């Protein structure tokens, strides 16, 4: 069996997320599977590294699929980019070991979150950032971020859909940056629970607005109560930035 790794970029604004939902084709996975299956002449399933939600974007999503047929990588890339909608782009196709699995073999993921932090709206970024019109205290946000780095039980930063055997995840780094009207948050870790990144960003926004004390973060982690974080950051500002294997 031949195994192929895809590197993918997409604008998630109009899609219902990565994961195919029954017969609903308006997903990233569904669109790519449809084109690959047409190319090969049989039903093909692709496995994505991250099952991004509706409205979330990707700069470097990774997926893989298997085929009985030996394929030429550059021809696959050309075919996919010719027939996929222009808000999905295949940036690389590579034949890999038959045991490579995009989801289970990933060692680290990095997400970037963009907040437009000006009083006025930014019409060009409304689908690609979250607008917070009150000035955020970035210094306090950085202090709060320090408490989230490391290995913790992140139950409080997940939602009810997160029913994993273990809720412990390790955050390798969590940066808060200011740049030309934006506050950007970059988080890297060994894995993330459902909505964990958006809840982390939501908590940092609450800290930045003075609604939550930075020093309360350790107690929130310890309590493991989901209702202690009231802000779920919008999907529009979230980007899957990088995946390491």
UniProtKB/Swiss-Prot annotation:
Transmembrane segments: none annotated. GO terms for biological process: tRNA pseudouridine synthesis. Keywords: Isomerase, tRNA processing. It catalyses: uridine(38/39/40) in tRNA = pseudouridine(38/39/40) in tRNA. GO terms for molecular function: RNA binding; tRNA pseudouridine(38-40) synthase activity. Coiled coil: none annotated. Substrate binds at residue 111. The active site is at residue 53. Its EC number is 5.4.99.12. Formation of pseudouridine at positions 38, 39 and 40 in the anticodon stem and loop of transfer RNAs. Belongs to the tRNA pseudouridine synthase TruA family. Homodimer. This is tRNA pseudouridine synthase A 2.
């Amino acid at each position: 069996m031949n195994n192929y790794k895809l590197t993918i970029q997409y604008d998630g604004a109009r899609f219902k997320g990565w994961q195919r939902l029954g017969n609903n084709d308006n997903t990233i996975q569904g669109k790519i599977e449809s084109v690959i299956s047409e190319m090969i002449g049989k039903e093909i399933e692709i496995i994505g590294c991250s099952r991004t939600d509706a409205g979330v974007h990707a700069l470097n999503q990774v997926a893989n699929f298997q085929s009985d047929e030996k394929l030429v990588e550059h021809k696959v890339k050309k075919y996919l980019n010719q027939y996929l909608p222009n808000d999905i782009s295949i940036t690389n196709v590579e034949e890999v070991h038959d045991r490579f699995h995009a989801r289970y073999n990933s060692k680290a993921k990095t997400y970037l979150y963009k907040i437009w932090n000006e009083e006025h709206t930014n019409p060009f970024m409304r689908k690609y950032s979250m607008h917070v019109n009150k000035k955020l205290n970035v210094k306090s946000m950085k202090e709060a971020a320090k408490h989230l780095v490391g290995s913790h039980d992140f139950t409080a930063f997940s939602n009810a859909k997160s029913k994993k055997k273990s809720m412990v995840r390790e955050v390798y780094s969590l940066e808060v940056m200011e740049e030309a009207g934006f506050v950007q948050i970059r988080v890297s870790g060994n894995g993330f629970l459902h909505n964990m990144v958006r809840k982390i960003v939501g908590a940092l926004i609450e800290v930045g607005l003075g609604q939550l004390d930075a020093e309360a973060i350790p107690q929130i982690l310890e309590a493991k109560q989901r209702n202690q974080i009231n802000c779920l950051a919008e999907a529009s500002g979230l980007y899957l930035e990088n995946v390491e294997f």
